[in-house]
């Protein structure tokens, strides 16, 4: 017996209780785990294009807002220039350069941007318009290398996006949604390599072409970025609108709008702001907003940037995002690494103005409602589980007390009945003995 119960009954009942308690306990902890997981998820989820062996690029909700319009500047008829200057002890030397910007103009010849190295080195990168065509030219110590897009004129007053990439002596150029143009100069054996976009600060001067005929690749000690091309001695500066400027991680227009001390503006340059009007100088060019940017980086060093531009919004963006690739060594100072199978094509053409709209990320109200719903669900599950456990314990307590009481009452009654029966039996036996003795004595006296 165990607590007034038979041992077999107790074992069966305890097994049932254990199963039920285990089920509710598991349900309770599962609810807690669901609540913790839901609470730890980021409030903003980013979209990525999935390719083979993709490497995700995490984006902070506060810093990379690619769906918002960027700063736009208007360069007047008198010409103007926006200049960014690196600090003297922080001038980068790069093997890979990436440049992207959007503009609208009616000029047939104009300089869009020029990047120069420190005095005496002679390295430079220039993007300009020649007879209505976009031309990129650079020199990293060997000779001038040109790459030009002749299939489309850009001096029509419409908004155009230009993307340029340099990897050593190789280069790519893309205007709007046209095919990417690639340029591989002779004498360069590393036609498929992409290096790290920034090297530690040091004075890397490439004096002459090596004897083996290799193309020099380092853009040494970059000093200034001049946007607009205007100079006081010249009057043929850029005239029109320009937005979304990006160069090796620098968003110069946003920095200028924020009052960065390294950015200086001269001439006829003014900030339009976040919301750009549909009318532009010299004939009303239309500027579309790049509403979302999606990035994926593969192991073959292919970086994709996709734009969706709805026609009903007249905004621009300077959130053109890129990523560096492999092989951090310097061609001129360190043994070359193994060539990879990557390509130089780094961008996907933007979608047309009739592309589907991309839904924005959830606002604070939606996030707050979702958080409240999750909290309420967890609290409800926990409260229900606790109530079920209390009811089960109360039922066990009542059932146990009822069984023990009936058992003790029955036992006491059986004991009393047995004792009374024994006493009665003894009394009857004694009476029979005394009666027989008296009868015998009486008979004996009678006969005597």
From Swiss-Prot:
Location of the Laminin G-like domain: 71-269
Gene3D superfamilies: 2.60.120.200
Record topology, Extracellular segments: 39-375
Membrane topology: Single-pass type I membrane protein
CDD domains recorded: LamG (cd00110)
Keyword entries, A-Z: Cell adhesion, Membrane, Signal, Transmembrane, Transmembrane helix
Signal peptide location: 1-38
GO biological process: cell adhesion
Cytoplasmic membrane side: 397-448
Localization, UniProt: Membrane
GO cellular component, one term: membrane
Annotated region described as Disordered, given as residue ranges: 426-448
InterPro entries documented for this protein: ConA-like_dom_sf, Laminin_G, Neurexin-like, Neurexin-related_CASP, Syndecan/Neurexin_dom
Transmembrane segments: 376-396
Compositional bias (Basic and acidic residues): 426-436
UniProt main location, coarse: membrane
Similarity section: Belongs to the neurexin family.
Listed PANTHER family: NEUREXIN-1, PIKACHURIN-LIKE PROTEIN
Function as written in the Swiss-Prot or TrEMBL entry: Neuronal cell surface protein that may be involved in cell recognition and cell adhesion. May play a role in formation or maintenance of synaptic junctions.
Protein name: Neurexin-1b-beta
Species for this entry: Danio rerio
């Amino acid at each position: 017996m165990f607590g007034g119960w038979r041992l077999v009954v107790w074992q069966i009942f305890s097994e049932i209780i254990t199963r039920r308690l285990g089920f509710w306990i598991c349900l309770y902890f599962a609810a807690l785990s669901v609540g913790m997981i839901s609470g730890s998820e980021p409030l903003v989820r980013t979209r990525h294009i999935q390719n083979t062996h993709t490497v995700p690029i995490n984006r902070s909700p506060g810093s990379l807002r690619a769906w918002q319009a960027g700063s736009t500047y208007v360069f007047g008829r008198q010409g103007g220039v926006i200049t960014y200057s690196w600090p003297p002890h922080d001038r980068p030397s790069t093997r890979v350069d990436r440049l992207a910007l959007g503009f609208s103009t009616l000029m047939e010849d104009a300089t869009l941007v020029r990047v120069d190295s420190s005095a005496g080195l002679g390295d430079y990168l220039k993007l300009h318009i020649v007879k209505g065509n976009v031309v990129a030219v650079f020199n990293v110590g060997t000779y001038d290398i040109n790459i030009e897009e002749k299939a489309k004129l850009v001096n029509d007053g419409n908004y155009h996006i230009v993307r340029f990439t340099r990897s050593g002596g190789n280069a790519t150029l893309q205007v709007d949604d046209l095919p990417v143009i690639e340029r591989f100069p002779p004498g360069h054996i590393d036609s498929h390599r992409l290096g790290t976009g920034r090297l530690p600060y040091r004075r890397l001067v490439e004096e002459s072409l090596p004897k083996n005929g290799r193309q020099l690749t380092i853009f040494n000690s970059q000093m200034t970025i001049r946007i607009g091309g205007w100079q006081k001695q010249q009057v043929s500066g850029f005239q029109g609108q320009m937005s979304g400027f990006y160069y090796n991680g620098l968003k110069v227009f946003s920095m200028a709008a924020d009052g960065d001390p390294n950015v200086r503006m001269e001439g006829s340059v003014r900030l339009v702001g976040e919301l750009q009007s549909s009318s532009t100088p010299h004939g009303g060019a239309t500027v579309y907003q790049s509403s979302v940017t999606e990035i994926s980086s593969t192991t073959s060093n292919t970086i994709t940037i996709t734009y969706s531009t709805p026609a009903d919004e007249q905004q621009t963006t300077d959130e053109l995002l890129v990523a560096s690739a492999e092989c951090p060594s310097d061609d001129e100072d360190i043994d070359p690494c193994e060539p990879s199978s990557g390509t130089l094509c780094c961008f996907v053409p933007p979608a047309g103005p009739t592309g589907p709209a991309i839904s924005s990320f959830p606002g604070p109200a939606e996030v707050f409602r979702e958080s409240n719903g999750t909290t309420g669900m967890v609290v409800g599950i926990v409260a229900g589980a606790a109530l079920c456990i209390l009811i089960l314990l109360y039922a066990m307590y009542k059932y146990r007390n009822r069984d023990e009481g009936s058992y003790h009452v029955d036992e006491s009654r059986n004991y009393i009945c047995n004792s009374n029966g024994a006493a009665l039996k003894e009394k009857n036996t004694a009476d029979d003995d005394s009666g027989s003795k008296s009868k015998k004595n009486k008979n004996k006296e009678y006969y005597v």
